[in-house]
Amino acid sequence: MLKFICYPKCTTCQKARKWLDENNIEYEFRDIKTENPTLEELSAWYKLSGLPLRKFFNTSGLLYKSMELKTKLPNMTDEEMLALLATDGMLVKRPLAIGEDFVLVGFKEAEWVEKLK
């Protein structure tokens, strides 16, 4: 079953959840703030996604900005970035939709249609 990981107060997450419901796609819901992704999960999702690791960061979030990660990330290794992401779910871009052979980061409807319909 599809894993849907989001922050319920996030409007983009709300749109994605509505889209899943309207398209009758079953999913397992997980609140990223109360159940932070583990280092192991993040590593697996990163490898499965084929995306640059920076795409997993919530660059518009307050925590990202207050930690000045825009200037720090270029000097960090993948291992350091994954460990940092695992410290707080609010650093992670959301929503995440995780299937057997794919990971969708953020809600871009065209990408979701391609993978989920």
What are the language-model segments listed below?
Residues 1-23, 27-32:
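Local sequence-structure signature of Cys/Sec-based thiol-disulfide redox active-site neighborhoods
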Residues 34-117:
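Thiol/selenol-based redox catalytic cores and closely related redox-interacting motifs
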